[in-house]
């Protein structure tokens, strides 16, 4: 365990090491999955005139797995895409059409018709056998200008190429930067590529938020194995982030696999090949999820909430979520105030069963990570302990404020009641967040 002030290694993967990282240098690479192309267009849905239509097409039919918002109020494209995947049993898809600048949510029969139009038109233009899946993002309750949308889809279909960066830009709303990851692995001697794009900066909460994400891979994997890989990928990525506790009507994560990498089809979820692909998908999803938190509306700090020693993983997740969604904790981090009492209160009211107050220890730390004591060289974690076995420890307010002035900080809570750990990523709550959301429609 930590002493009052210690240096420890902090687990860190190759994702994010500074606030908003090197977003300005994100670019297309040569590791795009075989057989996929993207087309984009600015049809005028956004007042800024920025790209707002994205069409993704595979030359070969794909297996698809997807997860959707758990909000009871679901947007028309969510309902349509979900029904198409169920109807076709996750197979035979070649295209996805996305618009930003309008959520097409709470738009009634007209909105449902517009989602169908987007689906049929885009699939027809790329000669796909099945309807396209559809995603939309933007303001809720406004009908899409379908003349603009149909023009945009047509233009995008005429300009299909290997340009994932433009695709990432086309789905942005309040995002400050595009979010794109590309990864290459080897399976059975074959080069397998994965590309992911996503958008999201507000209305972010576990079990999906105002977030759209598409992963495309040329791996050959069965639909059942693909569904399993996606589930495990999002459980510890998109379902482990929080910005403001609001859950959107449009959240969707979908993965397409066309098999053009040439590997032997992956059927078993116990195989070495499956585990390699799942790990790569999870790493892509984690990086994209953390990009969302770092790009959160008004955010100035990336916060890792690390719960250790939980009796069950469920308890760990419940407590991490309670801390990550606490407005008082988030504003304290913005103010660089080591108010550990707010964290302890969030633990207490979380509803988790395995909470024994006299067992709890707590640290605040500079740095980013999820497993204290495991990390890369030259990556020290500076931690200060504020609670030991349920009792406060002596603290130096000046040193604490300096520690919390870092852009990457960790809140570490050890329940000392088991061996399960859980990490959630969140951000601070700032004046700029209030400004951004009070003026969103204007």
Swiss-Prot record:
The record describes its post-translational modification as:
The alpha and beta chains are autoproteolytically processed from a single precursor protein within the mitochondrion.
Question: Which superkingdom?
Answer: Eukaryota
Q: What residue range does the UniProt record give for the transit peptide?
A: 1-23
InterPro entries recorded: Arg_biosynth_ArgJ, ArgJ-like_dom_sf, ArgJ_beta_C
Q: Which reaction does it catalyse?
A: N(2)-acetyl-L-ornithine + L-glutamate = N-acetyl-L-glutamate + L-ornithine; L-glutamate + acetyl-CoA = N-acetyl-L-glutamate + CoA + H(+)
**Cell compartments where the protein resides:** Mitochondrion matrix
EC top class named in words:
transferase
In alphabetical order, the GO MF annotations are:
glutamate N-acetyltransferase activity; L-glutamate N-acetyltransferase activity
- Keyword annotations for this protein? Acyltransferase, Amino-acid biosynthesis, Arginine biosynthesis, Autocatalytic cleavage, Mitochondrion, Multifunctional enzyme, Transferase, Transit peptide
Q: What is its EC number?
A: 2.3.1.35, 2.3.1.1
NCBIfam families on file: ArgJ (TIGR00120), PRK05388.1 (NF003802)
Q: What does this protein do?
A: Catalyzes two activities which are involved in the cyclic version of arginine biosynthesis: the synthesis of acetylglutamate from glutamate and acetyl-CoA, and of ornithine by transacetylation between acetylornithine and glutamate.
Report what the protein is called.
Answer: Arginine biosynthesis bifunctional protein ArgJ, mitochondrial
């Amino acid at each position: 365990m930590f002493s009052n002030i210690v240096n420890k290694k902090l687990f860190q993967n190759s994702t994010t090491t500074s606030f908003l990282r090197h977003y300005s240098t994100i670019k297309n690479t040569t590791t795009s999955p075989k057989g996929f192309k993207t087309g984009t267009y600015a049809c005028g849905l956004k007042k800024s005139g920025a790209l707002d239509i994205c069409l993704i097409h595979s030359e070969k039919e794909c297996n698809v797995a997807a997860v959707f918002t758990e909000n009871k109020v679901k947007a028309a494209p969510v309902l349509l895409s979900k029904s198409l995947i169920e109807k076709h049993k996750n197979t035979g898809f070649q295209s996805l059409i996305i618009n930003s600048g309008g959520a097409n949510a709470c738009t009634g029969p007209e909105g449902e018709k517009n989602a169908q139009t987007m689906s049929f038109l885009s699939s027809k233009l790329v000669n796909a056998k099945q309807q396209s899946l559809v995603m939309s993002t933007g303001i809720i309750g406004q009908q899409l200008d379908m003349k603009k949308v149909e023009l945009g889809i047509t233009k995008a279909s005429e300009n299909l190429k290997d340009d994932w960066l433009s695709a990432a830009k086309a789905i942005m709303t309040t995002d400050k930067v595009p979010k794109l990851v590309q990864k290459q692995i080897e399976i059975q001697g074959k080069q397998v590529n994965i590309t992911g794009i996503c958008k999201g900066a507000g209305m972010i909460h576990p079990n999906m938020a105002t977030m759209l994400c598409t992963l495309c891979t040329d791996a050959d994997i069965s639909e059942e194995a693909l569904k399993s890989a996606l589930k495990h990928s999002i459980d510890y990525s998109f379902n482990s982030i929080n910005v403001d506790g609001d859950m959107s009507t449009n959240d969707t994560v979908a993965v397409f696999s066309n098999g053009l990498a040439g590997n032997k089809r992956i059927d078993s979820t116990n195989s070495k090949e499956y585990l390699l692909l799942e790990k790569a998908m999870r790493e892509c999803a984690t990086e994209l999820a953390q990009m969302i938190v770092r790009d959160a509306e008004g955010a100035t700090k990336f916060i890792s909430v690390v719960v250790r020693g939980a009796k069950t993983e469920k308890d760990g997740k419940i407590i991490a979520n309670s801390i990550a969604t606490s407005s008082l904790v988030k504003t304290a981090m913005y103010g660089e105030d080591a108010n550990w009492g707010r964290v302890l209160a969030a633990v207490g009211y979380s509803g988790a069963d395995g909470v024994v107050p006299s067992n709890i220890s707590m640290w605040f730390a500079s740095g980013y990570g999820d497993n204290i004591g495991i990390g890369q060289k030259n990556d020290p974690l500076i931690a200060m302990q504020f609670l030991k076995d349920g009792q406060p420890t002596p603290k130096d307010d000046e040193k604490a404020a300096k520690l919390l002035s870092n852009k990457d900080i960790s809140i570490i809570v050890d329940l000392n009641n088991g061996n399960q750990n859980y990490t959630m990523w969140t951000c601070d709550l700032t004046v700029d967040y209030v400004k951004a959301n009070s003026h969103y429609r204007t």
